[in-house]
Amino acid sequence: MRFMVFIKFTEDVGDPPPELVEAMSKAIGGAFADGSMVLTGGLYPLSESTEIRVDQGGLTVVDGPYAEAKEVAGGFAIIDVRDPDEALESARQVAQLHRDHWPAWRGAIEVRRIAGHDDAG
C-alpha cells in the first residue's frame, strides 16, 4: 500500500538543526534500503509557490504566501508499506525524531493513502 506523508508546520520555525538533518538522513537512507521509501523531499517556502484557484468567476493565479495558511507542508514522502499501521508507525518515528532533535518544533505529520495504487504489490 502506498501512502503520502506530509510534514506540516508553521513557516516561522526557522531552519532545522543539524542533528535533525542527520537523524532524518539516516532514517531516510534506511527506508530506501528496505524498500519502504519511494520518494521524499523538502518543499520551498510558500513565498515561492503559486496556486491556481477555481471559482465561479473562472481561474485565478495567486502567488504565495497565502494569509489563510496556518500550517504548511514543508516536506513529503511517498512510502510503500504493508498496511495502514505500518504507515502510521513510520510517521510516528518521523514525529519522534523531530521531538528529540528539535524540541521547539510544533507541527503535524499527516498520512494519506494514495488512491488507485495496486495494493498487491
Predicted stretch roles:
Residues 1-121:
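Conserved, structured core segments of small domains
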